Every structure is written in C-alpha cells, then in structure tokens.
Amino acid sequence: FFTDRVRDTLGIDYTRSNILEIESGPNCGQLTGRMVDQPWGDICDGAEKRKMLLETCAQLGIAPSKAIAMGDGANDLPMMGVAGLSVAYHAKPAVRAQAMVAINAGGLDRLLEVVR
C-alpha cells in the first residue's frame, strides 16, 4: 500500500515490498501484521533482497545505479549496497551509517522530498 502510493505519486515503474493482511472492521480495515502469501515467503534475507533488486533492474532494462533501495535493518544492506540511492528509513544505527540518506522522522512520503 505505502510503496504503491509513492510509486503512483512519482510515476515510478516498479516497487516491491511486503504485503500485509488487512482485516475488515466496523469502521475500516485494520492491519493484522501477518503477511499475505508472497513468492519469497515471510522471511526475505539480505541475499534475496539484493537478488530481487538486480533481477528487477534487469527486467526493466535499467542499471542498478538507477534504483532506489529503502530499508531499516542489516538484512537490507546487501540490497542497498547495489542501488544508486540507498535510504535508511527509521533504521538501526548501522544501517543509517551506511545509507546515502536517512529518514528518521515522518512517513514514507518523506522520500518524495529526497527524489523530487
């Protein structure tokens, strides 16, 4: 949901993120915290994230230097290391130290300030 919003606002070709389950409630949907079935399973380690970034770039015919990778944990660092722009999002100190940009406050829409 969140990455789709950023994608649509910026006209980005492709985004990929975990998909969380939403349960219907009396007023609106609520996130359950459970993942919807995803081809990569519930756990996506650093090697898988890096592989998917490289495969996605190849499918789109772009260099990884044109990709943006955003993460918060050590398992995101391999993916962030091959992207042209690495963004630490409310990340652990080690990730913030290695990222090109750190977003420490606010929502995902803060990325718009970086890429516009």
Regions found by a protein language model. Name each.
Residues 1-116:
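C-terminal cap/substrate-recognition subdomain and adjoining C-terminal extension
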